[in-house]
């Protein structure tokens, strides 16, 4: 296959022979729904997982509107997104995001603050259609 994408309510696994736009939804944060990642073609599986303390039914011990983690191992992307969402703040971002791990990159949103770390796909302006957002 040349293209495969599985989306399970904020957790995405993909490989693709073309660019794929992935909208960034962060609840009531000012940037929510206004930007998307442009994920370039992937010959290997890429996990893109999001956790939120303010969106959805999952229990979170944090305050972030969205923590998006990228990893070649989708289970690691999911685990890191959940773990980081439980503890991340604008003040501690650089201290809690690991520099050496299976993560490719982290994109975090908390209110009007955005933090990034590692290698991330290009972020472009977008008009994310809320009707296309999957529910886990």
Task: Walk through the language-model features, giving the residues of each.
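Mature catalytic core of soluble alpha/beta enzymes
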Residues: 1-136
